[in-house]
Amino acid sequence: MGEETTIMGTVLSVVFQNEENGYAVLRLVTDDGELLTLVGCVPCAAPGENLTATGSFSSHPQYGEQFSASEVERYLPSNETEILNYLASGVVRGVGPATAEKLVARFGIETLQVLESEPEKLTAIKGMTARRAQEISAAFNEQMGLRRVMEFLAHYDLPAALSVPLYRRFGANAMAALERNPYLLSDSAFGVDFSVCDEIALSMGFGGDASLRTEAGLTFELSHNRDAGGHVFLPREKLLAATAQLLDCDVDAVEKSLDDLIAIHRVVQEGVANVTACYLRQSWEDETYVVTRIEAMLADKPDALRGVERVIKEIEREQGVQYAPLQRQAVELAAKEELLLLTGGPGTGKTTSVRAIVALFERMGLNVLLAAPTGRAAKRMGELCDRDAQTIHRMLGMTFNDQTGEVTFTKGEKEPLEADALIVDETSMVDLSLMRALLAALRPGCRLVLVGDPDQLPSVGAGNVFSDLIRSGRIATVALRDIFRQAEQSMIVRNAHLVNTGMPPKLKNAAANDFFFLPRRDSVRLVETVVELCKTRLPDKMGIPADELQVLTPTRRGDAGTRSLNFALQAALNPPKPGKQERRFGELVFREGDRVMQTRNDYDVVWQKEDGTAGTGIFNGDVGKIAKIDPSGELLEIVFDDRTATYTSDMLAELDMAYAMTVHKAQGSEYRGVVFIGAPCAPSLMVRGVLYTAITRARELLVIVGDDSAVNKMAENDRRSRRYSGLKWRLRKGGEEK
C-alpha cells in the first residue's frame, strides 16, 4: 500500500456491488481526467455520483492500479449529464434509462429536487400515474436516507459499513432515529463504544437531556453484561452502581431513569431468590418461557413405550455390547421421561448411551432428530451415531430479519419440528435464547434428551442453562462417572478426570503414548517448541498432519497468546511463495491455504455445498481454510467444512487466524491432536474449567507446553465466574409449589 492521499472524481460504472455490506468496485474518472478503479465501502453506488475519497494506491498484476478507499464522501450529480447517468443506472427503483431521459428532459437540473420533495410534479410526464410517482419518490428518498447516514458516520469518524445494518434496522427512518437518539449506536448490533456515543450526543446538543443519557447507560450496562459476561440479569444495586460509574454521575440520578424504564416495561424488575433482579425485557421473556415449557414437559407423561427391556437386550446382542447399569438407566429413563439430562466426562460412555437411546427410539417407531450447537459438534455426533445430525440453527430454520436485525426461526410453536424425539449434544454450549427457540419448536409429547458435560466452560451467550437445569434437581438426570476399561488406558481421559476432581494432571508418565508435557518457562523457547511440534515433530513421529493439530491457549494476549502464536505458526506452516495469493488487512496477511476463524455471527454470508445446497450464515467460532484469493485481493473463497463462502476484502475484519485459538473458541470441537499452552496468564483464565475443557478437546494426542506450576494451579482453582440467572431458582420454586 502507498501513502494515504485524497482523490475527487465521478463514478463511470459499478463493476461490483455487495448489497449486504456495501462493498463496491467502481470505475472512476478523476477531476484530473484520469481513469482508475476504486474499491471500498460505497453502498448503493451509481454512475454519475461525485466522490471525494481518502485512501491509498496499490498495484495488482491482473487488475493494474487500484485506489483502496478508507473514507468516501459522496455528492449528488451536479449537471444534467451526470443526473441522467445516475438515474439511468437503475439505482432508483422504478427508473430506467427511458424514464430517466424523460425526467431530465422535463425538469433538468431540478430533477433530483423534484424526486425528493415534489413528486406530484412527476405526473406531468406522459404515462406517469400519481401512485408510480409516489413510489419513485419513496425509492429516491431511500437512497438519500442511506447517503445521509453515511455522511453522519463519516462526520464522526465511524466506518461507512455501519450504514448497512443501520438502514436494515430503521429503513428510511435511520437518520431520524440517529438524530433522535445517537446512543442507539451502542447496541450490540452496531458495536460502537458507549463513550463514543456519549461524545456524539454531546456534540449534537444532547447534554441537557439527562434522562436519554441515563436510560441509554442503563440499557447498555444490561446488554453489555449479557453479551460479555453471560448475565441474564443484574442485581438492581449493581446495575445502578455500574451505570453511575459509566456516566460519572450520582446513583440517585440513575435510579429515577431505571424506574421509568421499568414503568414502560423496557426493563423488568423481579425478586429472584434474595436479589432484586433487573432484566432486559427480552432476557426476562426468554427465561420465563424456558421455565414454562420445562414445567409443562415435567407435568406431561409421554406415551409408554412397550417392551423396552426386550428391545434393550436385542440391541445389546446385535451390537455385541453389555450396557453398564447407569447406561441402561439412561436408556430406560429416555423411554419413560419427556425430558432427560445425560452428563459425563470423557470415557464414561456417553456416546454408547446416546447410540442406545437412538436405537431404542427408532425400534419403537419414533422419528428421531440429532442436533448440536456447532457445525463441528454436529458433524462429530453424526459420525459417532451413524445418522444425520444438524446444527440447532439449521434444524430450526434460522433466518435473519433485515428490518429488525434480529435472528428468527421458521420452526416454532406454529410450525414445530416433525420429530417424536430430539437428542442434543454439547448442551453446555446452548445459551438461554437458543434454548428458548429449541423448546418452542418441540411439539407436545416430543421427547428431549440433553447431553453434555457441565464441567466444561459455559456458553458464550447469556445463561448457564445446562448446569442450571441439572442443579435445579427437578429433571431426570443420569450422570455417567465410571471410566470404561478401554478409555482408562488413555492418559488424556485419566488426566481429565484428575483435573475435574481438583487434582493436578500426571505430567510425567513414561508409559503414556497420548499425553506429554514439555516444560518451557521461557516464552521464546515456548513458541519455538510449539512451532516445531506442529511443523515436524508431531506429523513425523505421531503421524498427525498439521491440518489435524490445533494449538489452544487460555488467552489472546501476551507471548503465549493467540496473536503471537498465530504469527509464528503462519510463518512456519504457510509461508509466502510465488503464485500464492495474499491480502493484507491491518496487521494480518491472509494467504491462500491459511486456517482462519470467523469472529462474529454474520447471518448474511452466502455459502454453497458441493451438491448445490446453498444457505446463509457463518458463525462466531467457525473455522475454515482460504482456498482462493482473487488476484485483485478483493475476493476470497473460504471453505468451512463442507461449505464454501465468498468474502469481500472489507469482510476480513470478521476473520482471524486460527492456527492457535483460545480454549473458549474451541468449545464443541474435537481434534486428533491438541497442543495446549500451560503458561501463566490472567488470573480469571487460570482456572480448572479452562484446563479441563482444553484436555477434553484432544481425541488421540495432547501435548502441554509450558510451566508445570501454572498447570497445577489451574487444576486446583475451581473458581467459576458467577452468572446472574434465575432459571435454577424458578424451577426449584416451581417444584416447591407443587
Model-derived regions, located:
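Hydrophobic anchor at the beta1->P-loop junction of P-loop NTPases
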Residues: L342, L370
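Hydrophobic positions on the alpha1 helix immediately C-terminal to the Walker A/P-loop
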Residues: S353, I357
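N-terminal pre-P-loop "Q-motif" helix
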Residues: G320-K336
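C-terminal accessory regions
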Residues: T613, N620-K738
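Conserved helicase motor core of P-loop NTPases
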Residues: P454-T616, A627, G734
